[in-house]
Regions:
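Active-site glycine/GP-rich loop and adjacent strand/helix microenvironment
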Residues: 2-176
Length: 176
């Protein structure tokens, strides 16, 4: 969503867009991004779009090194189900092929923009923030820890629309 991109871009000193208005690779922008003097660089995108971008035949012909750059991606895993790309394969392939410093995955919903749950490197679990929480429900009640159920997201951030409390279709569990 444009709102998600806007939110992440607020932290940027410079912004570069890898696609032009006709949805074609913008090689000039990509090269400018790589050559930028900023020390900390982040590539942001939605998971399925990131995968499509880095596997685009036109892009694969380029030998672009993202050494020292962090990739932040989230959402789009349901769209990736048909391609049978696992999270582990996604990370390993992009690190090996493009030399990313870090690859950070997050969980979030466009319906609750601003609430994102980053996956830790150590255990690959998603974590809440001080502004949000997750409740796991079975079909009737709040589920106990370590039992799978439907994910309900709670957030302090949305106040201009009723997005502070959303029951999703996703299945999850609280580990600790």
């Amino acid at each position: 969503s444009n709102v998600g991109m806007l939110g992440f871009s607020l932290m940027a000193l410079e912004k570069f867009y890898c696609y032009d208005k006709k949805n074609k690779l913008n090689e000039k922008e990509i090269k400018a991004f790589i050559k930028s003097k900023n020390k900390k660089k982040i590539v942001f995108g939605f998971t399925s779009k990131v995968w499509a971008f880095f596997n685009d035949s036109n892009f694969l012909k380029k030998q672009i090194n993202f050494n020292g750059i962090t990739l932040v991606h989230g959402g789009g895993w349901k769209k990736m189900k048909d391609s049978e790309v696992s999270k582990k394969y996604f990370d390993e392939t992009l690190k090996k092929k493009y030399n990313f410093l870090n690859i950070l995955n997050y969980y979030g919903l466009v319906e609750q923009t601003g609430s994102i749950f980053f996956q830790c490197k150590l255990h690959r679990h998603f974590h809440t923030t001080i502004f949000s929480d997750i409740i796991i429900r079975d079909k009737n009640f709040i589920s106990v820890n370590k039992k799978k159920g439907i994910v309900q997201l709670i957030s302090l951030l949305p106040f201009s629309y009723p997005g502070h409390n959303i029951l999703t279709q996703d299945v999850g569990e609280i580990i600790g």
